[in-house]
Structures are given as structure tokens and as C-alpha cells.
Amino acid sequence: MDEEYLALLERAYKLVAPKAQRRAEIPKIEVQNMPRKTIIPNFGQIAKRLNRDVYFMAKFFQKELAVPGTIEGDVFTLHGEKSPKVVEAVYERFIRYYVVCPVCNSIDTELKREGRIYVMKCLACGASTPVRPL
């Protein structure tokens, strides 16, 4: 009976999908300080890899840092001097609130608007989680 049980258990483990791994690592943010400006040259590339709208990300950064900004191509310019550590902390907060699935910790998520609420749908585990409004 033990051998039969172990054989069935082995078969069940083979049928179950392996634990979801992160498809990609979180991209690093590049921050360049200029006089009275802070430039993020890889902002568009980051938004594309995280599967987020560039304007949604920019709005979050502008509200968190309390400075206006402009997007030109892949470059996001904040019209105020902010230290790279502060910008990186805001970026990590964005990742935590709007990218990482709270159920399985995967970054394979998409953000959809349902009425007045933003909902994060995980592509790895299928969980739907409402997120904080901007």
C-alpha cells in the first residue's frame, strides 16, 4: 500500500505546475541630476517592462515628489531637484503598491480600471486585487 501511495503522490507532483517564478527581474531606475531638474532617461523602458502606462507612472511620481514633470519619448523630466535615493524610494513604493502581486509576489501583473477603481490582475496566479487610488 505504501508503494502505491508513493507512486500516486509522485504522479500528482508531476501533474501539478511548478511554483511560479518571476519572469523578469525588476529593472533598475537611472536618475540624473541637473540644475533644477531630475531626469530619468529609462522611464519608458521601465514602464514597458513592468506592463504599466507611462502616464500613470509619471502621475504617481509627480504626486509623491510634489513636483511637475514632462515625458518626452522614453525620458521623464521632473522639474525640481530630487536626490537619486528619494527617487529610488518612490520607485520602490510604486513597485510595491502597483506592480507586485500581494498573493504570489509575482511582477507579472496588469493594471485595469473597473469603473472608478484600479484593479491589479496577476497573470501568474489569477488573483485580482484593488489598488490604492492615485
Curated annotation (Swiss-Prot):
* InterPro entries for the chain: IF2/IF5, TIF2_bsu_arc, Transl_init_fac_IF2/IF5_dom, Transl_init_fac_IF2/IF5_N, Transl_init_fac_IF2/IF5_Zn-bd
Q: Please give one Gene Ontology molecular function term for this protein.
A: translation initiation factor activity
The chain's disulfide connectivity reads: none
Domain of life where this protein originates: Archaea
Which keywords fit this entry according to its UniProt record? Initiation factor, Protein biosynthesis
Family that this chain belongs to = Belongs to the eIF-2-beta/eIF-5 family.
Tell me how this protein assembles: Heterotrimer composed of an alpha, a beta and a gamma chain.
Question: What is the purpose of this protein?
Answer: eIF-2 functions in the early steps of protein synthesis by forming a ternary complex with GTP and initiator tRNA.
What protein name applies here? Translation initiation factor 2 subunit beta
What species is this protein from? Pyrobaculum islandicum (strain DSM 4184 / JCM 9189 / GEO3)
- High-level lineage: Archaea, Thermoproteota, Thermoprotei, Thermoproteales, Thermoproteaceae
